[in-house]
């Protein structure tokens, strides 16, 4: 286990003692947010986050609000990035946590983590948590100035049920699972060696081949954008500088669920909102960017990977054309 942990730490540019094994990013997010805030009671109870976060972050923040914490959401710009000036305005002496996703799961927007970390240098009692679930293998990870970072191995072809929390070694957080600490005092329970080995292998493959994989996916994304832009009712929600693995769009006048179901009849799988969102509600991420409820309800997401082929894109475009003619005309 020590050798595997050393390997994971080396790949991430972290120290072995900064690696905490969890059951997934949802647990990692809960451990980081609740652990940081509970350990910072003597400083304050003010938290800053965004409307773009995964439901495990939103759920943890709601639980902390019930315990007396105050949560402010920083404004989102039209390109999907956070408004850094608004962040500066929201920061207070009693702010103990800023929680931001590195890459938004619905739009693919890459947040300016380094700039955020630089701003927080003037607030030594405030910790920065980054949910990097959608970032590994898709963009460069920024650990400098980050106190905790959640990682979900199944997003880069590791196993479901495994997760990581990278925690700065001098940071003290409150554990959420109590008992005998096996590899860390911050998360009780003995990690599964097989799971840990799968994380290291998947992480190594993702990072060693990252540039080639990104270039392949970017070419497919450009092809999709060029072809889908020919349809007058198509509106792209993902910004141009998003990670190419995620392409969020809306077809005006057609609910995203309708398109999802019609494409599903042709064995094409697309997503409406994030997988862990409440069914029947609009996409908070798309609404935060577009400020348009109808557009948010019409949105859906295409996910690409280095395993996606041009032939699959061509087949998708043929199926999309049939669905568009049936639903949008």
Model-derived regions: residue spans:
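Pyridoxal 5′-phosphate
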Residues: 1-329
């Amino acid at each position: 286990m020590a050798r595997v942990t050393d390997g994971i730490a080396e790949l991430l540019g972290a120290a072995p003692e900064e690696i905490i094994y969890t059951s997934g990013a949802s647990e990692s997010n809960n451990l980081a947010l609740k652990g940081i805030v509970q350990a910072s009671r003597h400083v304050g109870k003010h938290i800053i986050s965004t409307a773009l976060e995964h439901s495990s972050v939103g759920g943890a923040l709601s639980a902390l609000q019930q315990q007396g914490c105050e949560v402010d959401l920083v404004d989102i710009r039209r390109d999907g990035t956070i408004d850094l000036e608004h962040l500066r305005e929201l920061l207070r002496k009693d702010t103990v946590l800023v929680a931001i996703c590195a890459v938004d799961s619905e739009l693919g927007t890459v947040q300016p983590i380094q700039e955020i970390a630089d701003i927080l240098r003037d607030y030594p009692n405030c910790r920065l948590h980054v949910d990097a679930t959608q970032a590994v293998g898709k963009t460069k990870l920024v650990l400098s100035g980050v106190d905790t970072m959640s990682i979900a191995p199944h997003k880069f072809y590791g196993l479901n049920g495994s997760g990581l929390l990278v925690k700065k070694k001098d940071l003290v957080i409150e554990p959420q699972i109590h008992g005998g600490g096996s590899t860390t005092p911050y998360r009780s329970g003995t990690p599964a060696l097989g799971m840990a080995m799968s994380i290291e292998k998947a992480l190594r493959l993702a990072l060693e081949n990252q540039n080639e994989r990104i270039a392949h996916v970017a070419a497919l994304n450009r092809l999709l954008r060029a072809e889908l832009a020919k349809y007058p009712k198509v509106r792209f929600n993902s910004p141009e500088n998003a990670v190419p693995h995620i392409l969020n769009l809306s077809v005006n006048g057609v609910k995203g669920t309708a398109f999802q179901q019609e494409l599903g009849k042709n064995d094409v799988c697309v997503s409406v909102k994030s997988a862990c969102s409440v069914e029947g509600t609009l996409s908070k991420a798309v609404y935060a960017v577009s400020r348009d409820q109808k557009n948010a309800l019409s949105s859906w997401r295409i996910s690409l990977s280095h395993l996606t082929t041009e032939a699959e894109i061509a087949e998708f475009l043929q199926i999309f054309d049939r669905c568009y003619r049936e639903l949008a005309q």
